[in-house]
A protein has these predicted regions:
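Cytochrome P450
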Residues: 1-449
């Protein structure tokens, strides 16, 4: 008798019913109840066969210990996506909906060995220079601006109007984007992840980041872009563009969903309100149970190997389910007895998130400021009417409608910048008529009113 003979029934709506096929991690059924899918996948053992999109096969690690083994074994499991056998054999094309997040790019996420160490150290050292006071000031300024745009209405979509925009604005400030370049960075990243004309959005983003690199070569400032440029790793312009695109894109999407998922938890679980709105605790619980990047960390075996009893061939695509690993039955007792931050939401090993402390700080500050400004904010629709965006990687709500007592809209007193990193010291970048006067420009104008 093999594992399939005793397998439980797949979740309702799962196309794997009776077919023996790989379990699909896309579509509304998976988005509506991913934990039911993870429970089913655990029957296979520590790893299971899944499909990320039609025709895109992968092995998904669902066990905490096996996930740690993979993430920490950089000798046996590599990150360079040029090893991806199915892609090299033409079974997965560059037009696949999952290709943008899996295909190789010359950045530290897809690098191994000495290249990874050099690129990663440059990123880590540059991000470590971000002062928490500056981060708090920037988050508060941007939070105040965003709330001023919808506060008078008495209702808002806390995702589209707030959580989705705030990380991009904060990153624009930290990376020293002047008005025109910042507008196009916002346009590019939003389009890439929202799937609206993603090809154009990607082109706009990389062109804007390329101009930012040229700008900072000519006139560096006190910002992450300039620090990365001056690092002893001596990154080339091409390397600079790809590291910045990674930090901006891969940082903004999970962070906006972390803010959104934590807000969702605070607004739908009464115990946080009873206990004084413990934002830090709600954040940790979200990272354990509803992490914004639920299934990711693509790896490729360097040679035919075995992982927790599963046979893998060289070049197979292997992902880690942070959501499944964090919520495994064996972890329940140890989670209560041990650290509340031993989850895998930030990944682990040499490719763990280099920006987890800034991400925590931005999330807590953004939610604290929102609750201070809108103390009676509450969910505007029944919780069971909320929908989650389909897709194999992210755990993200489509919308988060809220209502509150309207607050007076107007110019708020904001702290002075003190760094000049938003572009006041920069030469003007070439304008793009389609994005002229965009969101970043409007925020900078609001700051100086």
């Amino acid at each position: 008798m093999n594992a399939h003979d005793t397998a439980p029934v797949p979740p309702p709506g799962c196309p794997a019913h009776g077919s023996g096929a790989r379990v699909p991690l896309y579509g509304p059924e998976f988005a509506a109840d991913p934990q039911a899918y993870y429970e089913y996948l655990r029957h296979y053992g520590a790893a299971a066969p899944v499909e990320l999109a039609p025709g895109v096969e992968a092995t998904l690690v669902t066990d905490y210990a096996a996930a740690l083994q993979l993430l920490q074994d950089s000798g046996s499991f590599r990150k360079d996506a040029r090893r991806w056998r199915a892609f090299n054999e033409g079974k997965v094309g560059p037009d696949s909906p999952v290709a943008p997040l899996l295909a190789y790019r010359p950045n530290c996420m897809f690098a191994d060995g000495a290249d990874h160490i050099r690129l990663r150290q440059a990123v880590t050292d540059s991000m470590a220079r971000v002062d928490t006071r500056r981060l708090s000031r920037s988050t508060e300024q941007i939070s105040g601006y965003l709330i001023s745009q919808f506060g008078g209405r008495g209702s808002a979509d806390l995702l589209g109007d707030y959580a989705k925009q705030l990380p991009l604005f904060v990153f624009n400030e930290l990376f020293g984007c002047p008005a025109d370049i910042g507008d196009r960075v916002l346009f590019g990243i939003s389009g890439m992840f929202d799937g609206v004309n993603a090809e154009k959005a990607t082109s706009v983003l990389f062109q804007a980041v390329g101009e930012l690199v040229a700008l900072k070569r000519a006139k560096p400032g006190e910002d992450v872009t300039s620090w990365l440029m001056r690092h002893e790793a001596r990154l080339s312009d091409e390397e600079m563009v790809h590291q910045l695109a990674l930090l901006l894109g891969a940082g903004a999407e999970p962070l906006r969903n972390l803010i959104g998922n934590t807000l969702h938890r605070l607004l739908t679980h009464e115990r946080y309100a009873r206990e004084g709105g413990l934002i830090d605790e709600a954040l940790d619980d979200t990272l354990w149970e509803n992490p914004p990047m639920s299934n990711y960390a693509p790896h490729y075996p360097a040679a035919d190997t075995e992982l927790a009893g599963q046979q893998l061939q060289a070049g197979d695509l292997v992902l880690v389910s942070f959501a499944a690993a964090n919520t495994g039955p064996a972890l329940k007792a140890s989670r209560q007895a041990g650290s509340n931050r031993a989850h895998l939401a930030w990944s682990a090993g040499p490719h763990a998130c280099p920006s987890k402390e800034p991400a925590r700080h931005i999330t807590v500050s953004a939610i604290e400021h929102l609750f201070n400004e809108l103390p009676d904010v509450e969910l505007a629709v029944p919780e069971d009417s909320l929908t989650w965006r389909p897709g194999p990687f992210n755990r993200a709500l489509a919308t988060l409608p809220a209502r509150f007592t309207p607050v007076r809209s107007g110019q708020r007193t904001v702290p002075q910048q003190g760094t000049g990193s938003t572009g006041q010291d920069s030469r003007p970048a070439p304008e793009r008529p389609a994005e002229r006067g965009g969101m970043w420009s409007q925020f900078l104008n609001w700051l100086t009113r």
